[in-house]
Curated annotation (Swiss-Prot):
This is Photosystem I reaction center subunit PsaK 2. One of its GO terms (cellular component) is photosystem I. The keyword Phosphoprotein does not apply. It is found in: Cellular thylakoid membrane. One of its GO terms (biological process) is photosynthesis. The chain crosses the membrane at residues 21-43, 65-87. Keywords: Membrane, Photosynthesis, Photosystem I, Thylakoid, Transmembrane, Transmembrane helix. The keyword Phosphoprotein does not apply. Its main location: membrane. It comes from the Bacteria. PROSITE patterns: PHOTOSYSTEM_I_PSAGK.
């Protein structure tokens, strides 16, 4: 009973969304790496806890897992904001 109601509702909803593409991916990757470079040097205690096994620890200041997760989270926020802004400006 419930599945037939859901199928009926799905058939009436128009598909207005665009398909996903790779245009903003390099911007998000670059923003994450930039924030990781900055965060390893600006966080008060970047080495407290388990170390993140990164390929070039000296470049990234050998951050802990918590520093890495915080940097990636903030990098994604900055990157998505940049992609949305550039998309609204028509650059991407």
């Amino acid at each position: 009973m419930l599945s037939s109601i859901l199928l009926a509702a799905q058939a009436t909803v128009p598909n207005t969304g665009t398909t996903w593409n790779w245009n903003g991916t390099p911007i998000i990757i670059a923003s994450c790496l930039l924030v990781l470079l900055i965060a390893g040097r600006s966080i008060r205690y970047p080495h407290v806890g388990t170390k993140m096994p990164l390929p070039f620890p000296s470049i990234f200041n050998n951050p802990s897992v918590a520093t890495f997760l915080a940097a990636m989270s903030f990098g994604h926020i900055i990157g998505v904001a940049a992609v949305l802004g550039l998309t609204n400006l028509g650059v991407i």
